[in-house]
Amino acid sequence: MRFGFSTAGESHGPAEVVIVHGVPAGLRLLAEDVDRDLARRQLGYGRGGRQKIERDRVEFLGGVRHGRTLGSPVAMLVRNRDYANWERRMNPAPVEDPPEPITLPRPGHADLAGMQKYGFGDLRNVLERSSARETVARVAAGAVARRLLGEFGVRVFSAVYRIGEVAMDRALAAAGAGKADRSEVRCPDPEVSERMKAEIDAARHARDALGGEFVVVAEGCPPGLGSYADWRDRLDARLAAAVVSINAIKGVEIGDAFEAARRRSSEVQDEIVRRGGALGRASNRLGGLEGGMTNGEPVVVAAAMKPISTIARALRTVDLSTGEEARAFRERADSCAVPAAAVIGEAMVAVVLAEAFLEKFGADALEDIRASYEHYMRRIGLPARRADA
């Protein structure tokens, strides 16, 4: 089975659940590997009150024994501590005194289209699953992918380079992505970080919210992940789809795509050069991807996130129970979630790269995958990377 995952759970239900399939046997995997990324997702200047309640910790339900994967699906659970405050409203069992339905859909959310699609009379049935709380499960799956990629020296980082009108050079942000965890807004430039925080404070004071842009960088990918032979296997398309599936992400860019559209071809292509005894590139304007495949340079994927749709200053809507104009229902939300989205972006990029890696080198046992990888790297004249390389 191909590497991938499925999630289940509602925002204020008992737990978020994820099943990761296609995980090879023999991979070292500990709860702390997952908890580290779960904690990073919860950080970030501008987060809402929910993060003061939750203390996300993973529980393995299957697929791992004594710290090693078994080759069977890895099942994980992250409990929602806030469920204790929502048990009557979100109990899976019938209740004698159900809560009043919510009929004031919020612009920018899945509320109205979701109610129309599924025939619901209560938008709670939509917003609970469409909530970004589901990304807890994605980050857990991404942590498994990160551990697998790490065995072969592939590392995935992210950095925020824009929040609202405050921005830094994206190339500099990508180069400093390994240091982004030091910043409350995941921006590697300390001076820009402070201006971003001030921008978030101003939006919060105005009872509003901010979006922004982040970049994910994957270093150490061997050439040849993905394929040009079938459109479904093209890696840039798969990466773009995975990243834009994150809540509130409205645009994705591979390398310098939009800048390249304004330049001549001779100014855009990454020329092939010798690096010692191996082949490399003189630049990385195409973001490490050519013809739907990795080319050995760092994979660079940027994303644009719109502002969180739920704001204190409720927007106009129509009450579906009366047909009258009204103000939208307000659910607790963040002022800015771009730093958290960057961590989720890492997870989605890691999942896609892990899937492509196992397609190329096999998927049953880690030992066999390593042998296949090392043989391939010898054949193309590049050194094989190891864990922590």
Swiss-Prot record:
Its cofactor is FMNH2. InterPro entries: Chorismate_synth, Chorismate_synth_AroC_sf, Chorismate_synthase_CS. GO terms for biological process: amino acid biosynthetic process; aromatic amino acid family biosynthetic process; chorismate biosynthetic process. GO terms for molecular function: chorismate synthase activity; FMN binding. Pfam families: Chorismate_synt. Its EC number is 4.2.3.5. NADP(+) binds at R41, R47. FMN binds at R129, S130, S131, N247, A248, G291, K306, P307, I308, S309, T310, R332. Reduced FMN (FMNH(2)). It catalyses: 5-O-(1-carboxyvinyl)-3-phosphoshikimate = chorismate + phosphate. It is an enzyme of class 4 (lyase). GO terms for cellular component: cytosol. Keywords: Amino-acid biosynthesis, Aromatic amino acid biosynthesis, FAD, Flavoprotein, FMN, Lyase, NADP. Pathway: Metabolic intermediate biosynthesis; chorismate biosynthesis; chorismate from D-erythrose 4-phosphate and phosphoenolpyruvate: step 7/7. Homotetramer. Belongs to the chorismate synthase family. This is Chorismate synthase. It comes from Rubrobacter xylanophilus (strain DSM 9941 / JCM 11954 / NBRC 16129 / PRD-1). The gene is aroC.
